Amino acid sequence: MVQLNIVRKMKPGSAAAFIASFQKCKESTVKEPGCIDYSIYQSVEDSTVLFIAETWKNEGELAKHGETEHLKIHAAETKDMGDPNGKGNFQKIYICPKANQK
């Protein structure tokens, strides 16, 4: 399995629109055969900080997700919502490396 942990700092006033776009994308994403989890959380301490958690069966399924139309739409809708001065983080964890062999 592949786990993605993503922290995004949003421009003030953009978090709600980002979450709405994410939820639209999620409707199709969770139907992808390789998707195990696709969730978003908002910080209770700073409403401009979002945490995205994705779990995929393997690297190949994650790569397929990257080419989907619904993800491309989400990316286009949200491309200017991130705070350019905000600190974000991206982490990819291989939970069971043997499962990622093609």
Model-based region annotation:
Residues A15-A16, K26-T29, I40-Q42:
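Intrinsically disordered, low-complexity segments enriched in polar/charged residues with Gly/Pro
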Residues S39-T48, A76-K102:
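Glycine-rich beta-strand-turn "strand-cap" elements at beta-sheet edges
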Residues V2-R8, S39-G66:
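Short, well-ordered beta-strand segments in beta-rich or mixed alpha/beta enzyme
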Residues K24-D37, T55-F90:
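An amphipathic, aromatic/His-enriched active-site/gating alpha helix that lines ligand/cofactor pockets
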Residues M1-V2, A16-A17, P33-C35:
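Short, flexible segments with low predicted structural confidence
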